[in-house]
Amino acid sequence: MNARRCVAVLGFAFLACACPLPPPLPPKAGPPPPPGEIVLDHGFIVLQLHTPPGPAGPKPTVISFLADQELLLAAGVVVATYRLEWKLVEAFRPPEPPPAPGAHPVGQWLLAAPSPKTVGKGFFGVITTNAESAIPKIVDYLATRPEVDAARIGVAGNSTYGFTALQAAAADPRLTAAVSLVASGDYRCFLNLSNLAMAGKPLDLDPVYARWLDEHDPVRHPERLVHTALLMVNGKDDPAVPLACAERTARVLRGAYQRAGVPERFRFQLAGGGHVIEEAARRETLAWFQRWLIHPGS
């Protein structure tokens, strides 16, 4: 089983890449996908391409998790959106070990865990499956399409998918531009300070989980990102993704881009407000892709 397939098969499990389970059989043939949908990875990835009317020839393309695609389409960008069919791999998810005696649940939403030892494990499992398994397969496919310029593929996302965009850019050097909105690349800081995780209480992760987390954490491997023109935009008053974590991420990444001799390829922008910064994000996202993906070098 190759590494990408193993990650996809086990989804939420943070030990997925190391598990010895055999690969699943391809699902039985079902009805054809709806018009416009492209099925990849035995049906696990369902992709849609939104193509602008012009210009002719290969175009810049953005794998986008953003709700508003119209600005990119109007700028002549192919927009790729997708979903993952988790139900196809749920049966291969290994059971979670029982919590230790006396453990107390922590966290909220996808970051919830039966004890502080594994806070955020499911959240980062979802991110890693998207960033390091699904998106590289989508890039493989995009490179075969005549309307796509394979040298100008980017990724953009906000919140959970802002984390995904950041980690995907670190994992795949073919992504030449990225926009990460209201996210952080310092995973330990995020788990420590976010009101969705430990909310400032001490972080005490299981050692195996901690090692896995550090391997995928962008701030611990900032050199993996310097091939990508990266924009980060964060809210100043965001309890979900605290400013301190965004600023730590920016400080580490800015240093990496400077050491690589390309400081202009990284930008960190603060917006007023909290976790919802749509208007600022729209402006900054389009301007960044105009500079680095649509008209690079101009």
Model-derived features with residue positions:
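Bacterial N-terminal signal peptides
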Residues: 8-17
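Short beta-strand element of the alpha/beta-hydrolase
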Residues: 56-67
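Conserved alpha/beta-hydrolase
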Residues: 74-115
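N-terminal cap/lid segment of alpha/beta-hydrolase-fold proteins
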Residues: 21-56
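Primarily recognizes the serine-hydrolase "nucleophile elbow" in alpha/beta-hydrolase
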Residues: 136-199
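Alpha/beta-hydrolase active-site loop
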Residues: 103-146
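C-terminal catalytic histidine-bearing segment of alpha/beta-hydrolase fold enzymes
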Residues: 250-251, 256-298
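The feature captures the conserved acid-bearing segment of alpha/beta-hydrolase catalytic domains
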Residues: 189-254, 258
